[in-house]
Amino acid sequence: MATATTLAIFAQAKQVTVTNNSDFNREVEPIVISINEKADYKSAVVSSDGNTLPYQLEDIDGNGHYDQICFITSLKKKEKKQFLVTLHKQEAEQTFTPQVYAEMMLTNKKIKSQNKQDLYISSLTVDNGTNPYWMLHHHGPAFENDMVAYRIYFDERQTIDIYGKNRKALELKETQFYPDQEQKANGYGDDVLWVGKTFGLGALRGWADNLPQMLLDVDKRTMEIVACGPLRTIVKVVDKGWNPFYPEKCDNAKRIDMTTLYTLSAGRRDCAVDVTFKGDIESLKLATGLINVKNSEEYSDGKGLRGCWGTDWPVSEKDSAGHKRETVGLGICIPADNIIKELPANSDNYPYVVKPALGEIHYHITFASDNETFPGSFHTPASFFEYLRQWKRQIESPVTITTKDVFL
């Protein structure tokens, strides 16, 4: 809640109407409104029916000015709600309880403990051929809400790995993705998936020679924490000057820029993946999908929704001491317009060949751990696959958002 507020006299207000046209309830619905970054707004008040709501101002393009605002609501089926969003040009003394967390850090070799690292960074860019995987603690940015946590490997794989939880809590600041034995005994979560060179949970790769290709030939690779709360985390991955024809060589004119945003909102286990491109992508083919967890059961609707449920060691054999086999459910939802082909499962992956549509790809990933003990958890393939079907219904029938300027 806001503890104190000191706002400017000059403000702009927007009346925001959100309509759930679906025949099902929406318990956690992020609402995102674009704002005029030239106005240089510094704070806001979001209210509905006399209640003030937490919000988050975001600078997606990184130019130092906020360009959108996010808040979260719930809606019953067919329900319509109105909100008043007032934007101010002065900063406000507001404190909202953090519901998400994100971190990226360099490994401090002077500190032996894996959950006491302290070299925090928010962005890193490396040149072609440079691999910072072993220089970064937990190998790249990590982000969470109280239900789930993700990390992205900072190397040519750019794999999404997962951290499952037993109870609802923010944990990464304390465990740094590597809980010690005392933390495990006290109910903290842990890494629950071994990904290797697979897609993990929905990594986007190149496609050439009828095979998925790692993003090996990239002029500059950047990973950045764009937003880290209080309501959602956004991690940006930029592959600037990527050769999409690898392993063949290409001249600079044929290289493209690929920017990927990974967005995790409070109260949701799924992560939105939004990919945009610069350059000639007319014939671009890409690959994504899910790791084929050992002995996993597969689900597919044949139209972009795919999942699996299985059990395996979450680490390599040499690191298995102190770990147990983990049971997880994984899911991916890709729009039909982006799908070239759904490929049969192989020993590593449940793969797709995909392409941009209108120059972009927007898909979603999700997972569940059998360790979860909180409401809304899943412990059978049948229940998880039913969740996937309902999840796709929500994705394909978004709420309607309209805005109208209001003069105060």
List each language-model region with its residue ranges:
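Extended, loop-rich substrate-binding clefts of extracytoplasmic carbohydrate-active enzymes
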Residues: 183-265
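Alpha-mannosidase-like glycoside hydrolase catalytic domains involved in N-glycan trimming
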Residues: 12-116, 120-122, 126-131, 138
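Primarily extracytoplasmic ectodomains and periplasmic/lumenal surface modules that are beta-strand-rich
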Residues: 23-27, 37-42, 92, 143-144, ...
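Beta-strand-rich recognition/accessory modules
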Residues: 59-75, 330-408
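Solvent-exposed N-terminal domain segments of exported/luminal and surface proteins
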Residues: 89-216
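Solvent-exposed beta-strand/loop surfaces of large extracellular or lumenal domains
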Residues: 45-69, 246-253, 294-313, 332-339
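Acidic (Asp/Glu-rich), glycine- and aromatic
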Residues: 258, 264, 269-302
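Bacterial Sec-dependent N-terminal signal peptides
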Residues: 1-16
